[in-house]
């Protein structure tokens, strides 16, 4: 398989970094504007990035870090959220909840209104929950590889 122009492949998926200031829902909608030719049972639409292993986490973090090197405190949306059921985090692409990299006491649902997830600068554990209505300046969209 291959990735569309400007997208980067890793494993069986394609990733693209964008410097766009959007809320979480706007970011997910933005990612859904990208697609690859349908493969039937596999979702061919883009979503905010999901992460399923330490190697994928490291890849995404390195891509994020190298794309934002002029920014000292960059923050980037991930597709992980518990908007449907508090405490039950899910990925927007429907993939399994099988990996997390929360910082410290996160997710803490501070002020009972933090249902979305961002990645922050700092290798290793770097996910923090925050209000979905917040604006973040960066995101990575994820697509399946073209067959």
Curated annotation (Swiss-Prot):
Annotated motif Cell attachment site, positions: 39-41
Tissue expression from the record: Coelemic fluid.
Residues in C-type lectin domain copies: 1-143
Record InterPro entries: C-type_lectin-like (IPR001304), C-type_lectin-like/link_sf (IPR016186), C-type_lectin/snaclec_domain (IPR050111), C-type_lectin_CS (IPR018378), CEL1-like_CTLD (IPR033988), CTDL_fold (IPR016187)
Pfam family, one: Lectin_C
The UniProt record lists the keyword Secreted: yes
Molecular function (Gene Ontology), one example: carbohydrate binding
A GO CC term assigned to this protein in UniProt: extracellular region
Domain of life: Eukaryota
Subcellular location, record wording: Secreted
Modification after translation, per record: The identity of the saccharide is not reported in PubMed:3571253, and it is unlikely to be N-acetylgalactosamine. The sugar attached to Ser-38 is represented simply as Hex.
Disulfide feature: 3-14, 31-141, 116-132
Entry annotated with the keyword Disulfide bond: yes
Known glycosylation sites: 38
Complexes and interactors: Homodimer; disulfide-linked.
Function as written in the Swiss-Prot or TrEMBL entry: Role in the defense system of the organism against microorganisms. This lectin is specific for Gal-GalNAc.
PANTHER family associated with the record: MANNOSE, PHOSPHOLIPASE, LECTIN RECEPTOR RELATED
The name this protein goes by in its record: Echinoidin
């Amino acid at each position: 398989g291959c990735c569309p122009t400007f997208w980067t492949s890793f494993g069986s998926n394609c990733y693209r970094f964008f410097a766009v200031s959007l809320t979480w829902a706007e970011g997910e909608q933005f990612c859904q504007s990208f697609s690859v030719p349908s493969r039937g049972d596999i979702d061919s639409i883009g979503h905010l990035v999901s992460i399923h292993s330490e190697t994928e986490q490291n890849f995404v973090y390195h891509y994020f870090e190298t794309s934002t090197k002029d920014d000292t405190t960059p923050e980037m949306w991930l597709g992980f959220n518990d908007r449907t059921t508090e405490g039950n985090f899910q990925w927007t692409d429907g993939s399994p909840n099988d990996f997390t990299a929360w910082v410290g006491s996160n997710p803490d649902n501070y002020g009972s209104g933090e249902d979305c997830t961002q990645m922050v600068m700092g290798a290793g554990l770097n996910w923090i929950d925050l209000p979905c209505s917040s604006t973040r300046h960066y995101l990575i969209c994820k697509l399946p590889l073209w067959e």
